[in-house]
Curated annotation (Swiss-Prot):
The lineage of its organism: Bacteria, Bacillati, Chloroflexota, Chloroflexia, Chloroflexales. One of its GO terms (molecular function) is argininosuccinate lyase activity. Its main location: cytoplasm. Keywords: Amino-acid biosynthesis, Arginine biosynthesis, Cytoplasm, Lyase. It comes from Roseiflexus castenholzii (strain DSM 13941 / HLO8). This is Argininosuccinate lyase.
Amino acid sequence: MWGGRFDEGIDARMARFNNSFPFDQRMWREDIRGSMAWARQLAQAGVISTEERDTLLTGLETVFAEFANDRFEARPTDEDIHTAIERRLGELVGAVAGKLHTGRSRNDQVATDVRLWTMGAIQRIDDGVRALQQALLTQAEAAGDALMPGYTHLQRAQPVLLAHWLLSHFWSAQRDRERLTDCAKRTSVLPLGSGAIAGTPLAIDRAALAADLGMAAISPNSIDAVSDRDFVAEFLFCAALIGIHLSRLAEDMIIYSSAEFGFVVLADAYSTGSSLMPQKKNPDSFELLRGKAGRLTGDLVTVLTVLKGIPSAYDKDLQEDKEPLFDAADTLELALPVAAGAVATARFRHDRMRAALDDAMLATDAADYLVARGVPFREAHHVVGRLVREAEQRGVALSALPLDILLAAHPACGSDILQVFDMDRSAAQRRVPGATAPGSVREQIIRARQCLGEH
């Protein structure tokens, strides 16, 4: 393909080092699609005849079928997926195969392949995130008005609806999908026609070429088109953040499924046992989901580091973009169905959650009670803090303090202060949009259904 100016063959060690076919062969669909579109444009531009175009297309269809049916036979000399397909095409149709690469460089060819592959990966991962959202929403709808402790710093904070907590993970997943949508816009840009660096001299209709390949736009600059993989980095950032969100959900589920909490029981199908301890039921599904976040972050850092040091235009360093790209997509395509399944089959223990609520979580409500009677919040905060300390010293719940102690805490306190020690009342008071009151949560559920295209 490129050996004409060389007097010696490539060293076997260098050939192995240079060879990307073992991993980039998975882009065979995209490479053949791009080559078929390019053949049509070569004929449209008068560079090849319609007969030659049809011969090339027929040959490429045969190569496609060989890959699709796992019958493609690679050769040791196949440097990458592009050379492998071109070599096989030559075996099938003869010398006319040599015309396919007219006006095209592997630089714009591979950039196109990677963009097409990434577009497909974005759609598959979006489907996976949506399935997780559906599982979260279904559980939220089933939870009704069940209360659970809300935690900050992993300390009991305020009562919230179980559905409210479930939906918190729904909305982070929704932003993940929005980021994927944005990433798709910048990925769906056609580099083909950019050549090696300066653009093709042929009268190629790049807009028609983009439409043929299902891409939304054409690249405005040939140097940028062949050299930048910012769309890969952006995709990997989206993937890494999805991993982080999966990790946070997993951490919650791991904690809540422990015997110390007992808020959730994981299905056997998403748990494992111990080789030694017969009683163990381990949340391995969520532990693995938590662990994958580090891998996804590593894929992002790999590509950012590759991109950092290279000058303008194409450099061989860019071959290193594919393995982290493929790894991140593979990881999420494996992880997301597990996450959705583990959430969908989990059984939430409303009784255990209710039992974990304690009066100290209503301290803010007591402060709000004083604020409603004209006490500045900072003063009210201090007053209730003293009451909490008094309850701790007596070893009783906040609501179990003698009424005279409560009344003596501040002149604004009346006997009706006892009304604040009601968990359901506490949640119901938080009625602003996005809050945990049952009505507000029902509004969230309606919005969530709309996000999923439901009514």
